């Protein structure tokens, strides 16, 4: 009896098939193009990066964006490849970018490895929470898009505007600065708040306020006692919709908030998250708006 030998061809996974097809078509470049281009081949990852692309009048270059890229409103008409920290290689490859402009922290690393293997040029834009940091972002994006001169002019103007806003805030006496608690979430009745080293900490200081919490870095859940002890004059939250919205009414029901000056006075400021924390082209205006909300015109 003879045995029949069956040869099986390995089945290509969707990702391998897409990657192979893309490479065979030569759609991916190996480096950012020099000189301004008219082709739509750029994927923008991160709300501030996308804002910068539009501010440089390079939106015609965009082929897609990530979920955090919601301004200007017309950006939301672009294909959405997902949240910047949870990108799938398939989603990115499906829009066939030649260049990815990304804020720091995009990932996961496995996805970035696949994109590098595909020969996609990836330019990572550092995240810093000051005027010079915004200028660096703009100049790096401009250089990658071949519009360095335009980027330098935009960066210089924004640095000047933000430094002027900061000078006005610096003139406020320390004793007159309001203590501000930035609350990211109140899920389960527990307050997730900003310490130091965050965009929230920086924007509060630039607007002339004082972060009520400086005992830790980043974002952490705080005990009720710690929140009450922080004694914020104002609660600052992102303006959200639906189940994630934090309202003055919901905050007033929390035992940690009620005894604080902010709780007693119902002092809650709500601002759009990207506008408030993006540290991009609109940040000088956001600083001025937050300062007005804290102290009046």
Residues covered by each model-derived region:
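Bacterial N-terminal signal peptides
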Residues: 16-28
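A short, structured surface patch at a secondary-structure boundary
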Residues: 40-111
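A ligand-binding cleft/hinge motif common to bilobed small-molecule-binding domains
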Residues: 108-117, 234-252
């Amino acid at each position: 009896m003879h045995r029949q030998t069956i040869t099986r061809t390995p089945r290509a996974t969707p990702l391998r098939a897409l990657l192979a097809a893309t490479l065979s078509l030569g759609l991916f470049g190996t480096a950012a193009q020099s000189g301004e281009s008219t082709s739509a081949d750029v994927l923008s990852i991160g709300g501030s990066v996308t804002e910068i692309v539009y501010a440089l009048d390079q939106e015609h270059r965009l082929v897609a964006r990530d979920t955090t890229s919601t301004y200007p409103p017309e950006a939301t008409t672009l294909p959405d490849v997902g949240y910047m920290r949870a990108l799938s290689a398939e989603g990115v490859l499906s829009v066939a970018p030649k260049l990815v402009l990304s804020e720091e922290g995009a990932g996961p690393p496995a996805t970035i490895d696949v994109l590098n293997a595909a020969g996609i040029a990836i330019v990572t834009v550092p995240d810093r929470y000051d005027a010079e940091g915004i200028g660096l972002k703009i100049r790096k994006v401009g250089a990658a898009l071949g519009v360095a001169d335009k980027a330098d002019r935009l960066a210089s103007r924004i640095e000047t505007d933000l430094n002027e806003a900061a000078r006005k805030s610096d003139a406020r006496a320390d004793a007159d600065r309001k203590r501000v608690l930035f609350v990211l979430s109140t899920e389960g009745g527990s307050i997730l708040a900003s310490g130091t080293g965050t965009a929230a900490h920086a924007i509060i200081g630039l607007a002339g306020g004082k972060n009520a919490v400086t005992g830790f870095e980043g974002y952490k859940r705080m005990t009720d006692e710690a929140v009450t002890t922080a004694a914020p004059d104002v609660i600052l939250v992102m303006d959200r919709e639906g189940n994630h919205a934090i309202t003055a009414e919901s905050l007033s029901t929390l035992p940690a908030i009620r005894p604080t000056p902010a709780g007693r006075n119902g002092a809650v400021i709500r601002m759009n998250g990207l506008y408030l924390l993006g540290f991009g082209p609109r940040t000088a205006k956001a600083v001025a708006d937050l300062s007005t909300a804290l102290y009046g015109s």
